Curated annotation (Swiss-Prot):
Function noted in UniProt: Ligand for members of the frizzled family of seven transmembrane receptors. Probable developmental protein. May be a signaling molecule which affects the development of discrete regions of tissues. Is likely to signal over only few cell diameters. Involved in the correct positioning of the developing nerve ring and in axon guidance of SIA and SIB neurons, probably by binding to tyrosine kinase receptor cam-1. In addition, regulates the positioning of some head neuronal cells, muscle arms associated with the nerve ring and the excretory pore.
Family (UniProt): Belongs to the Wnt family.
Compartments where located: Secreted, Extracellular space, Extracellular matrix
GO cellular component entries: extracellular space
Key words, A-Z: Developmental protein, Disulfide bond, Extracellular matrix, Glycoprotein, Lipoprotein, Neurogenesis, Secreted, Signal, Wnt signaling pathway
Molecular function (Gene Ontology), one example: frizzled binding
Disulfide bond annotation, renumbered to this chain: 80-91, 130-138, 140-158, 213-227, 215-222, 289-320, 305-315, 319-359, 335-350, 337-347, 342-343
Protein's recorded name: Protein Wnt-2
């Protein structure tokens, strides 16, 4: 069994991988991961090369927050994969390392989505852990009672501490973007893009929190209600960000060192301003149809598709015109279950033959 420390260390590496521009120090982090899995001594997590100097300092001050950072990042990646299931880009990780790979070296709309949802995921997990009393430097939310909560309802339950999660996520995640050399034009533009998308993810999470109430009274009479503020689920956040991904705005760095909105390539219309919750990107997306080690795309060969579907998961789209192979597989499942007195359920095993279509 892998020690608990190694488990959350693995998850933390997912977040560091997305943030990193994949310099040599990142690969040394991967090497240390292998050492950790082998059960040998490794550097303390705050000394891992994947952390920027500023992040290492924050890590040292808030070591008990690091499991929340790692779990929040993992939850975000899982939600990313759920939102893009059946698409050519499906937020896949590299099978050999469990990491997202060099695809985030490019300033694409996929990178924009990933940065935003990772930032939201860390904020979400930190806020929840504050509520649960698992972090020493925070507790329940101290938000005031919203105007839309009736006056006769009690406000004072223990709510998710989104304010603390928001601040910690901003301090820990964004600090590496502030450490880039502002004289390097492209790096500065990418850093501004990353920070904006990080902030969009956090703002979406914060804006969609809602009061949650619990009834008190004899036999469910609900004579009294106690309410508190609760964060949206990561699935809700993922759906909102998925819509933002489709409407992401292309930008470039101008002579003043700021992000400038570009005209939409399809409509030729230029937005005069972007909302704080809009996602922005700078580069075209690569061809996700074929495996490319340089760009980090895994390709769609071997992916399961849906024959006859006109959507993204359909074989015509997902297989990129290469066609597909159909295989027959036998699946065993429980069937004809009956309750026997007393007290067990007895089932038969049935064999079901199904067909599955796999992209060439």
């Amino acid at each position: 069994m892998i020690p608990r420390r190694s488990c959350w260390l693995i998850l933390l590496l997912n977040l560091l991988n997305v943030q990193s521009l994949l310099d040599a120090s990142w690969w040394s982090t991967v090497a240390q991961l292998s050492t950790a899995l082998a059960g040998h001594n490794v550097k303390p997590v705050c000394e891992l090369p994947g952390l920027s100097p500023g992040q290492a300092q924050v890590c040292e001050l808030f070591k008990d927050h690091m499991p929340a950072v790692s779990i929040g990042a993992q939850n975000a990646i899982q939600e990313c994969q759920r939102q893009f299931t059946g698409h050519r880009w499906n937020c896949s990780t590299h099978y050999s390392t469990g990491m997202l790979g060099p695809i985030h070296k490019m300033a694409t709309r996929e990178a924009a989505f990933t940065y935003a949802i990772l930032s939201a995921g860390v904020t979400h997990e930190i806020g929840r852990r504050c509520k649960q009393g698992l972090l020493t430097s925070c507790g329940c939310s101290d938000e005031t009672k919203p105007k839309n909560v009736p006056t006769d309802w009690s406000w004072g339950g223990c709510g998710d501490n989104v304010e603390y999660g928001y601040k910690f996520s901003r301090d820990f995640i964004d600090i590496r973007e502030k450490e880039h050399d502002p004289k390097r034009n492209h790096d500065n533009g990418r850093s501004l893009m990353n920070r904006r998308n990080n902030e969009a993810g956090r703002k979406i999470l914060k804006r969609h929190r809602k009061p949650k109430c619990k009834c008190h009274g004899v036999s469910g009479a609900c004579n009294m209600k106690t309410c508190w503020m609760q964060l949206p689920s990561m699935e809700q956040v993922g759906k909102i960000l998925r819509n933002k991904y489709d409407k992401a705005i292309r930008v470039q760095i101008n002579d003043r060192g700021n992000l400038q909105l570009l005209a939409d390539e399809a409509t030729k219309e230029r937005k005069t301003r972007a909302l704080p919750t809009d996602l922005v990107f700078m580069d075209d997306s690569p061809d996700y149809c074929r495996f490319d080690r340089h760009s980090g795309t895994l390709g769609t060969e071997g992916r399961v598709c849906k024959r006859g579907s006109g959507g993204a998961e359909g074989c015509d789209s997902l297989c990129c015109g290469r066609g597909y192979n159909t295989y027959t597989q036998e699946v065993k499942s429980k069937c004809n279950c009956k309750f026997e007195w007393c007290c067990k359920v007895v089932c038969q095993t049935c064999n079901n033959v199904t067909q599955v279509d796999i992209c060439k």
